[in-house]
UniProtKB/Swiss-Prot annotation:
Entry protein name: Large ribosomal subunit protein bL21
Residue spans of biased composition, Low complexity class: 1-21
Pfam family, one: Ribosomal_L21p
GO molecular function: rRNA binding; structural constituent of ribosome
Keywords: Ribonucleoprotein, Ribosomal protein, RNA-binding, rRNA-binding
Family statement drawn from the similarity comment of this UniProt entry: Belongs to the bacterial ribosomal protein bL21 family.
Length: 136
């Protein structure tokens, strides 16, 4: 069966979109340790961490980078990648959703209800650098 020209034209834009998404940094990421957890971070995206030191607008650097991946390939640290830094900007200090803890002992008339809201910091990933050079 021969392929019609209309089908060939339809597949070309899909390929160009895939290439455009690769060049925009979709495959650039770093896995870092922060707030006792591991996060997968990509440039120009925001994330919520447990409360970090710093005021709104301050710059924060994370040096506990476990893995860095870019166009050149991935670099895995043991335990951390040498000279890798993720630069963040503090956007806001927030509070997470309310979590209700309800404890009850049946037949004892004992009930206890507690609520908790976690203190969070919203940050924007500005850049990922390895050895002083931006990730490419």
């Amino acid at each position: 069966m021969s392929e019609t020209p209309s089908k060939a034209k339809a597949s070309k834009p899909a390929e160009s979109k895939a290439q455009a998404s690769d060049s925009s940094g979709a495959n650039q990421y770093a896995i870092v340790e922060a707030s006792g957890q591991q996060f997968w971070l990509q440039p120009n995206r925001y994330y919520d961490f447990d409360r970090l030191e710093g005021e709104v607008g301050d710059k924060v650097s994370l040096k506990e980078v476990l893995l860095v991946s870019g166009k050149a390939g991935a670099s895995l640290g043991q335990p951390y990648v040498k000279d890798a830094v993720v630069n963040l900007k503090v956007l806001a200090h927030r509070r997470g959703p309310k979590v209700i803890v309800y404890k009850m002992q049946k037949k004892k008339k004992t009930r206890r209800k507690n609520g908790h809201r976690q203190e969070l910091t919203r940050v924007m990933v500005e850049s990922i650098t390895v050895g002083g050079k931006p990730l490419s």
